[in-house]
Amino acid sequence: MNQFAGAIIFLPKDQTGTLMLEDILFDPAAAWLAQTLRAAGVERFLVVCHEDDRAAAVTCFPADASFVTPGDADAPQRLSAFLDGLDGQVLVLTAPVFLTDAGLAKLTAPGKLPRGESSGVFRLDAAALSAALAEDGSAEFEDVLRRCGEELGEASEWSYRTVFRLNDRTELMDVQYVARRLTVARLVRQGVRFIDPDTAYIGPNVRIGKGTVILPGTILRGHTVIGEGCEIGPNAMIRDCRIGDRVTVNASQLNESVVDSETSVGPFAYVRPNCHVGSHVKVGDFVELKNSVIGDETKISHLTYVGDSDVGRHVNFGCGTVTVNYDGETKFRTVIGDDAFIGCNTNLVAPVKVGGGAYTAAGSTITDDVPDDSLAIARSMQVVKKQWAAKRKKKSEKGMK
């Protein structure tokens, strides 16, 4: 049962910046802290930060969190109002800290707590803190915390540490390892397999379905969601994407996009933001997608750029296809219907539409719409000059004498 009705979190700033807004595995330390507390049932947050840090801090906490800066004229009143709305204990963190789930369990467990160096973590009754502040409004806040509450220490042995005071960026770097192992352990318990956990870097908000295998060199960031039975890696980076079930991503980068089930991506593919790749699609080697919709069962096997495009189902792209979407000022869209066949080395100069079932001949530069079930040929007629090379060689040899 959660023992904390709310949390007051300070984000101190020094000459090098605000340590709690520095990243631990791609997310600010404050976001890790907020996630740990929310998982334990803490619903109400009051964050004290520098005015310059407010915009960054807002992204780390729930939408209904309250924010106060030391210079706010009504800061004492807002603190009092926050405390008056709580019934029970409040957790107060006055220093940069990384708190694990196990650490929070120890903080909330009854009995003697581990002691060591100061952690900057306090627990106390919300009503008692409110009364003490009302009685002596000029007192230092941390003095009131020590007088009315209990500072919670941290174990001295590294292997047992669950509360990490972050005094500088070197300690922040050390905590990266702890955060990575905690994240991997959580995912393993949920049925995810790791070939080499020490080479996977996964942010705290990533969700992965059971049966998915994470290969070495994988980086997963942001609010990425990966389905069941996938194979990710080696050397894949995925940021803020939604990946379906049984998807393969091999040595590729995907950003802010959706990939439906049973699709394969890579190796060496680059999916840029705002793409929706359908199911049973092949996105092969050296393929780049940008701001495009790719229909089910389409194959883009190699050396192709598809940008600002709407592609139907069961389309085949030949090697070297380019959607020419930019004229130097404006981006234009390309539309390709179902069952179309795009020949190798085709340039599709947008805005242009290739109809359903239509073909483009290899080497064509398509500038006009192609009707359904038609063949477009846009290349020069081949001219063969017989014996031209032999004559040229003979002439060259004669000139050398």
Residue spans of the language-model regions?
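Glycine-rich hexapeptide-repeat left-handed beta-helix
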Residues: 249-401
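N-terminal glycine-rich phosphate-binding loop and ensuing alpha1 helix
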Residues: 1-57, 63-71, 104
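Residue-level signal for inorganic ion chemistry
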Residues: 30, 96, 168, 214
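Long, charged amphipathic helices and adjacent flexible linkers at domain junctions
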Residues: 176-203, 395
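Acidic, glycine-rich loop-and-beta core segments that form the ion-binding/anion-interacting portion
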Residues: 205-284
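Short glycine-rich anion-binding loops that position phosphate/pyrophosphate groups of nucleotides
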Residues: 13-15, 95-98, 381
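Conserved beta-loop-beta/alpha segment of the NTase-like Rossmann-fold superfamily
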Residues: 54-131
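Catalytic-core segments of class I nucleotidyltransferases/pyrophosphorylases
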Residues: 98-186
